[in-house]
Amino acid sequence: MTSPIQRRTLLLAAAVLPLAGACTAWSGAGSQSSAEAQLAELERASGGRLGVAGFNTGSGVRLQHRAHERFPLCSTFKLMLAAAVLERSTRDGSLLSRNLSYGKGDLIDHSPITEKHVATGMTVAAMCAATIQYSDNAAANLLLKELGGPATVTAFARGIGDQTFRLDRTEPELNTSIPGDPRDTTTPSAMSDSIQRLVLGDALGAAQRDQLKTWLLGNTTSTERFLAGVPAGWKVGDKTGSGSYGSTNDVGVLWPPAGAPVVLSVYLTFPQKDAKGRSDVIASATRIVVAALAG
């Protein structure tokens, strides 16, 4: 038989439990609201337009700012390009090992790897690594030519469920980043969702997915962007991008030492054509997202 004191204790516990749950939910919502405010202030202070789409792949919690607005892709398209090559390789077994010949006329600004191999050419796989890890522009154009042009990469994006990504031109023209120009753009939300499907989901076969992840983890261009914004011990697999109007981007996956990875896309652009890139803003946005989603 339950005593009056026990009954009162049980009733009090029953009353407190919903309040505890409400406090937890409020705390999480408050943290996210604070992070959203921090991103808005970061954008205001930068003088540009900032787009952010991050989500914790374990909890599903998202943090967004202008996540559904279009931003210039710049070199972040190269992640989708490499994925399209990997998908094609499942139907063309010799593709990755195929050696592509090219001449000095194919070299354009920022082609640090291809310029060293004009005499011998490079394999498709080596070009994928060069365009992801060093943002080699000539390699990107040669890969686009091998696949069939920018429209082929857009078609690949549609095939994995991305209705937003569009690639219209090649390097370096695709980096004009003119405000309001829909060419060569995507939204942070669409890019993050595609990255999740490609790197962590089943849009690619297991071997192709592992290869894409390996290329991304070997990126060398993120020192002042995602890498500058994550805590010590985190791994970053990403693709950066830069263009006119101060366009400064970074997209990819952030792996904590323990726990679920965070998928993140950050895009920044300015109204002035001669604006300088702001890698520091990308790093600051990364810190805000990581603190909110994985803290």
Question: Which stretches of residues belong to each language-model region?
Answer:
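Structured C-terminal helix/loop/strand segments within mature extracytoplasmic catalytic/sensor domains
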Residues: 2-15, 30-40, 146, 150, ...
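Beta-lactamase-like hydrolase cores
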Residues: 25-72, 288-292
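Soluble periplasmic/extracytoplasmic beta-strand elements of cell-envelope proteins
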Residues: 51-56, 64, 80, 101, ...
